[in-house]
UniProtKB/Swiss-Prot annotation:
Gene3D superfamilies: Potassium Channel Kv1.1, Chain A (3.30.710.10). Coiled coil: none annotated. One of its GO terms (biological process) is membrane hyperpolarization. The keyword Cytoplasm applies. CDD domains: BTB_POZ_KCTD7. It holds the Pfam family BTB_2. The gene is KCTD7. Keywords: Cell membrane, Cytoplasm, Membrane. This is BTB/POZ domain-containing protein KCTD7. Residues 1-35 are annotated as: Disordered. The keyword Transmembrane does not apply. Residues 1-10 have a biased composition (Polar residues). InterPro entries: BTB/POZ_dom, SKP1/BTB/POZ_sf, T1-type_BTB. The lineage of its organism: Eukaryota, Metazoa, Chordata, Craniata, Vertebrata. It comes from Gallus gallus (Chicken).
Length: 289
């Protein structure tokens, strides 16, 4: 009897036949990558932290308890050191946070014992508290100066139409004029008025009735734009013109802009009958260097 060993049906070339060793190779389970193979792959297991945690925040070193970092559950620090996220360490084994650490000590002091920073550091610490999402610290800081006063100031400015736009316009005009004239400073005329129209008639107070009783056509006669670069107003609040001027100067100064201002008169445009526009006009001097 002759036993014939042939190729699989449909196979035309002996070289195409698959050996048993080839089949085993094809169905092998993928190997678990080693640390070398994984390169920079992060650990899959939850990260374990010691009870006392050494920190490197932007190059500044701190040490605190793990419970301090986890004091408030809904904060970035609590999430970072919950074990759910991988925190890299520096060469000395300190857990690294890529953030300027100048005010991190104030953050830790609040987490430890509820201490608030001195007044001169309230603003920058508030910014750090926003970054780390520490709600209780934000609430406390908003109730102390200068942030409490700033909250009131912003409530007033919220009544001011186009305040930020007008502020930007002052800067742009001053910059353009200084560049065009190759000058160190630039001057602008700014009108600041609280009421929609100055209603005191020029040297004729008995005409005050026009303030309340005037037709639509008469009202249009009262509508005009003073010949100035920027106008602020009107608004409805107790704060007066000088309060708004203080806001303008403060906000420009906070942006590093040197500004001086003085009242140079009033708009004297004739409106109707004995009425003249008496909006105050201020000269703003912006010094660039």
């Amino acid at each position: 009897m002759v036993v014939v060993t042939g190729q699989s049906k449909g196979s035309g070339d002996p070289d195409e036949a698959m050996s048993s060793s080839d089949a085993e190779d094809d169905f092998q389970e993928p190997a678990t990558p080693t640390a070398t193979q994984a390169g920079q792959a992060l650990p899959l297991l939850p990260q374990q932290f010691p009870e006392v945690v050494p920190l490197n925040v932007g190059g500044m070193h701190f040490t605190t308890r793990l419970s301090t970092l986890r004091r408030y559950e809904d904060t970035m620090l609590a999430a970072m050191f919950s074990g759910r996220h991988y925190i890299p360490t520096d060469a000395e084994g300190r857990y690294f946070i890529d953030r300027d650490g100048t005010y991190f000590g104030d953050i830790l002091n609040f987490l430890r014992s509820g201490d608030l920073p001195p007044r001169e550091r309230v603003r920058p610490v508030y910014k750090e508290a926003q970054y780390y999402s520490i709600g209780p610290l934000l609430d406390h800081l908003e109730d102390v100066q200068p942030l409490k006063g700033e909250k009131v100031r912003q409530a007033f400015l919220g009544l001011m139409p186009y305040y930020k736009d007008h502020l930007e316009r002052i800067i742009e005009i001053a910059k353009l004029r200084a560049v065009q004239r190759k000058a160190r400073f630039a001057k602008l005329k700014v009108c600041v008025f609280k009421e929609e129209m100055p209603i005191t008639p020029y040297e004729c107070p008995h005409f005050n009735s026009l303030r309340f009783e005037r037709s639509e056509s008469e009202a249009k006669l009262f509508e005009h734009h003073c010949e100035v670069d920027v106008s602020f107003g009107p608004w409805e609040a107790v704060a007066d013109v000088y309060d708004l001027l203080h806001c303008i100067v403060t906000d420009l100064s906070d942006r590093g802009i040197t500004v001086d201002h003085q009242c140079i008169g009033v708009c004297d445009k004739h409106l109707i009958n004995h009425y003249y526009c008496k909006r105050p006009i201020y000269e703003f001097k912006i010094t660039w260097w």
